[in-house]
């Protein structure tokens, strides 16, 4: 697997460039090997141009079984991923988007089970409309979420709001159907779930108090969350999850990407679709039994040895059931199997 970056959105550091991003990519490759037994190679591209990155990756794609896009700033990351999916016949996966979405879905599944609510009946408000925030909502909506309001620095995102980039305009058309306007503090009233992928201190205790009964908080900004767990619980939160390892319920992408790529490679998949992501999320959520499920334990630990095999198996089965495998689609595998090869 190639781990590709341009160094424009490195976690906690921002736009530091490809050279400075190299150690982070090397660390990612080490995690691939340690947690998924997947060999990975860091590729740091010295360009911020979408077409440059797409061309570079396309030209080397034949050397890899999959591409993991990493730490590329929004909205360019969406365009790069989309174009690579069109030009490459191997899986393209932007972990900052989809890995985070998978883990969040797994956490939401178990948190809702704990408080006795259903996804298609709850109201979710998010803070942050970048790569992770948008991917999370898209995946949750594919599972039946209906009532969701996304917010950014300027407040609620709704159709017709001025100054939205094309990606936010797209999201405005499928979210916030009542066109609620205002700040996060105004639109979060009555919400069942808050999902933050934004900035430290965005969510206050007063906001939590205005949410519905047994509110669920995903405060995933790193290294400082939107609200700290003790503050959220003091304000009435039933379940709190963060991106930090020193608190329970860590949303950690290492629960997803190693096992997901292991399953993708095992199935010789040519794509990563929503069905495969959902399968990964349910596999992760299922590692916490009903007997074990508590407000302090909705997600397995990053070092849980069961994670890789559970995720890999679920993803591979989903890939095969959807026939998104290169054995069926890749020209190289068709040649090997003699499919479509004219015999003399």
Q: Can you annotate each of these PLM segments?
A:
Residues 323-344:
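Single conserved hydrophobic/aromatic residue that forms the stacking wall/gate
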Residues 42, 68-71, 92-95, 126, ...:
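General beta-strand structural signal in soluble alpha/beta enzymes
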Residues 169-238, 244-246:
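Rossmann-like adenosine-cofactor binding region
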Residues 11, 18-33, 94, 98, ...:
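Glycine-rich phosphate/diphosphate-binding loop of Rossmann-like nucleotide-binding domains
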Residues 36, 87-88, 144, 213, ...:
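Short, structured coil segments at secondary-structure junctions
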Residues 2-122, 312:
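Glycine/serine-rich phosphate-binding loop and adjoining beta1-alpha1 elements at the start
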Residues 95-96, 115, 219-323:
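Adenosine-phosphate binding glycine-rich loop
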């Amino acid at each position: 697997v190639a781990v590709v970056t341009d160094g424009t959105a490195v976690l906690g550091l921002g736009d530091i460039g490809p050279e400075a991003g190299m150690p982070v990519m090397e660390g990612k490759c080490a995690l691939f090997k340690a947690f998924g037994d997947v060999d990975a190679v860091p590729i740091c591209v010295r360009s911020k141009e979408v077409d440059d990155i797409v061309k570079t990756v396309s030209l080397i794609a034949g050397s890899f079984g999959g591409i993991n896009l990493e730490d590329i700033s929004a909205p360019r990351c969406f365009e790069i991923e989309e174009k690579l999916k069109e030009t490459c016949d191997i899986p393209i996966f932007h972990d900052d988007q989809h890995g985070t979405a998978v883990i969040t879905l797994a956490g939401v599944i178990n948190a809702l089970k704990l408080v006795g609510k259903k996804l298609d009946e709850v109201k979710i408000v998010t803070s942050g409309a970048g790569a992770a925030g948008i991917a999370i909502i898209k995946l949750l909506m594919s599972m039946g979420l209906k009532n969701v309001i996304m917010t950014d620095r300027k407040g609620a995102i709704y159709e017709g709001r001025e100054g939205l980039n094309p990606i936010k305009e797209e999201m405005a058309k499928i979210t916030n159907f009542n066109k609620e306007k205002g700040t996060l503090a105004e639109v979060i009233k009555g919400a069942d779930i808050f999902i933050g992928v934004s900035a430290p201190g965005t969510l206050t205790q007063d906001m939590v108090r205005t949410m519905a009964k047994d509110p669920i908080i995903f405060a995933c900004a790193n290294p400082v969350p939107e609200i700290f767990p003790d503050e959220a619980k003091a304000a009435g939160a039933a379940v709190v999850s963060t991106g930090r390892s020193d608190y329970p319920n860590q949303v950690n992408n290492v629960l997803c990407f190693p096992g997901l790529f292991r399953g993708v490679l095992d199935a010789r998949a040519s794509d990563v679709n929503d069905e495969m992501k959902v399968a990964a999320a349910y596999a992760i959520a299922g590692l916490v039994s009903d007997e074990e499920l508590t407000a302090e334990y909705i997600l397995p630990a990053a070092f849980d040895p069961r994670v890789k095999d559970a995720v890999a198996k679920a993803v591979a089965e989903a890939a095969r059931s959807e026939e998104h495998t290169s054995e069926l689609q890749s020209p190289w595998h068709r040649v090997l199997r003699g499919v479509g090869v004219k015999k003399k």
